[in-house]
């Protein structure tokens, strides 16, 4: 369940803090299921500086373990999120991406600071260079945007 995933990620932060990790530099990124979790964690964990969600489902999920959806938590985002999506993703319709963009504009300050990039001709998994849907141009651009996003949201001094 989502609650367990959030608790597990929180436990990772505790562990990192106890083992020399810099908790002023907490960022998150995830792909597919992890992209969905990235959105949810950005609404859950105030220690996040920013996050990047790669083609994570935004609306209705895959059953009773996923009762909360990213579109439902935009008003609770505690960190700005960059969402990277493909126009040809059969599992995440462009209409869902547009609905999320509209919701972000009405959400928290962090939601309004969030962005979504929709890649033309890109499918779900466009970053996975070991899969047939790999799109080199979108993957390279997405990676550069991911790194820039994290640099754009530095830890507090």
Segments predicted by a language model, with ranges:
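N-terminal cap/leader regions of alpha/beta-hydrolase-fold enzymes
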Residues: 1-157
């Amino acid at each position: 369940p989502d609650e367990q995933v959030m608790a597990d990620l929180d436990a990772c932060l505790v562990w990192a803090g106890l083992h020399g990790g810099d908790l002023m530099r907490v960022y998150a990124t995830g792909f597919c299921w992890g992209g969905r979790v990235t959105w949810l964690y950005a609404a859950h964990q105030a220690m996040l500086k920013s996050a990047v969600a790669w083609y994570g489902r935004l609306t209705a999920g895959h059953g009773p373990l996923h009762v909360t959806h990213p579109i439902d938590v935009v008003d609770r985002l505690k960190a700005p999120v960059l969402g990277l999506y493909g126009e040809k993703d059969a599992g995440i319709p462009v209409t869902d991406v547009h609905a999320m963009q509209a919701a972000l504009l009405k959400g928290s300050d962090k939601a309004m600071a969030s962005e979504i990039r929709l890649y033309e001709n890109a499918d779900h998994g466009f970053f996975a260079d070991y899969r047939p849907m790999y799109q080199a141009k979108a993957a390279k651009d997405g990676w550069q945007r991911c790194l820039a996003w994290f640099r754009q949201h530095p830890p507090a001094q």
